[in-house]
Design a protein with these regions (language model features):
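A beta-strand edge to alpha-helix "cap/lid" segment located at domain peripheries
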Residues: 1-27, 34-138
Length: 138
């Protein structure tokens, strides 16, 4: 599938997640094997095989989830786009969303359009540093 913009690819990514469709999910990912995925509290997964296996397990267990994406920040040039956002996740049977997940999604442009090369998702810290002002960690 050809995605004309990084936003198109990202929309398809979250739609595939919501409907639990592995074929649609993997259509978003680059066909190259130099792709990486890090799920919350998970190890670094490299390559289509490892990433597809992880998504197959997640999608089988996540039917009916819904996302609201907020505070999207985007950095784009001609060949690479990085989007940082909050994933607000609603699970069937629960009355309120789960605590937000902070996600970084990177997309690379090629003749076949924009495709995901990185998805890194982490739980938001209880004491979100964005609410405290700048902190120095290095």
């Amino acid at each position: 599938m050809k995605f004309l913009t990084p936003s198109d690819a990202e929309q398809a990514f979250y739609e595939a997640f919501e409907i639990g469709e592995i074929t649609a999910m993997m259509a978003v990912w680059s066909k190259d094997d130099d792709i990486t995925c890090i799920h919350p509290h998970g190890p670094r997964l490299i390559g289509r095989s490892a990433i597809e296996a992880s998504w197959r397990d997640i999608l089988n267990a996540s039917i009916g989830v819904r996302f609201q994406l907020t505070e999207i920040r985007e950095f784009v040039d001609q060949a690479l786009a990085v989007r940082v956002l909050y994933e607000n996740l609603w699970v069937p049977g629960e009355n309120s969303p789960r605590p937000p997940i902070i996600a970084t999604n990177a997309y690379r442009y090629s003749k076949s359009g924009w495709h995901m090369v990185l998805h890194h998702a982490s739980p938001m810290p209880q004491d979100d540093p964005e609410n405290r002002g700048a902190a120095v960690f290095h």
